[in-house]
């Protein structure tokens, strides 16, 4: 039962994780690095361009990627996310956080097929980053069994685990329903996928359900 896991001890988790910061401004990269170090992170790499970031992800596997949406010239953060997903350089057990000053729905939603795990808006304070990272790391640790099966393309097993998580009264209900709909779609079960989208829209107005 996934939801019965003890609360994640973040102070013990940070030193074990690897981080990649992608931003075209050196001062911002340095600021984020200092914040992560203060949380206990020890393995922190940085990139100033999309090309360098994708190269790094080809040779190294990062647990957490913090990527600015607007990188100036070349690919933006959304395009990096899409390329990493398509080339399977970014596992579902990893976390991709989009950093953006943009607040429009078009940017926040991005390409519906490839969405980041979370967003953080500039300017970023240490408190805000610590809180957001803590939420995402806790979620990822609790849902790791599901994401591990997705990475292995064991979609039927992932569906079973998602259903168990929902039965256990998970706090990540929206994520589970969204993931279930995607998994049914991958298995060609459009009937169940459509049912989830419709059921969700009858209770809450969620962008991903409307897009589905």
Which residues does each predicted region cover?
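Receiver (REC) domain switch/output surface
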Residues: 129-140, 145
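C-terminal output/effector regions of signal-responsive regulators
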Residues: 145-212
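Short amphipathic alpha-helix used as the core "switch/output" element in two-component signaling
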Residues: 78-91
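A short, hydrophobic beta-strand element within the central beta-sheet of small alpha/beta folds
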Residues: 91-105
